[in-house]
Amino acid sequence: DLWKSEHSSSFTAMRSRGGGFSSTQFVDQLGVLGPDCHVAHGVYMRADDRRRLRARQTAVALCPRSNRVIGLDAPPVGAYLAEGNMIAVGTDSLSSSPSLDLLEDVALLFDLARSQGYEDQDLARRLLQAATLGGATAMGLATGPDRLGQLQSGAVADMCVVDVPVTSIVETIDTVARHGAGRV
């Protein structure tokens, strides 16, 4: 259980007796962080770790349903958004997630961000951007002739249709983010 909760006694004891730096600081000292690297899950990132990821242009792929299955805490999605970190949305795999429906993870991230105090009205748009361009960026596929994750002249047409009622642009984006799961 020592790796499952930042607040467990074994985790805090290990951190207090560690080498004086986080795993993010450690891999940064090795020169690993950068735009050609992404962090999976990003659950136990403190403010300094998040700042370091921003400084190195390293994206974080958030997989909140997988975190629940394997017993991890929720990612600090509200902090990532408020502080301007590059995020992507992931499902992990069927070995640790009930399905590969990316929009289920988007909906959960929406609820988590709100519960963590992120109140900006851009939440749905930013999470859908994380699920599209954010994912392409994290995988190094957002630039070049075969770029993905964006509707743009010259980009690869990699699209899906989500069956939701179309109202205003803002309301439709909100509906896709919060209720689009299972409607692709």
Regions found by a protein language model. Give the residues of each.
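Short acidic/histidine-rich active-site segments
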Residues: 70-73, 80-104, 151-157
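Short beta-alpha connecting loops at secondary-structure transitions
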Residues: 88-94, 112-123, 175
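Mid-to-C-terminal alpha-helical segments outside catalytic/metal-binding sites
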Residues: 126, 133-137, 141-145, 153-159, ...
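Histidine/acidic residue-rich metal-binding segments in metalloenzymes
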Residues: 1-59, 71-87, 146
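Alpha-helix capping/termination and helix-coil
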Residues: 31, 81-87, 110-117, 131-143
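C-terminal cap of metal-dependent C-N hydrolases
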Residues: 156-184
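Active-site beta-loop-alpha junctions enriched in small/polar residues
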Residues: 42-45, 65-67, 92-94
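Divalent metal-coordination and catalytic microenvironments
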Residues: 39, 53, 60, 92, ...
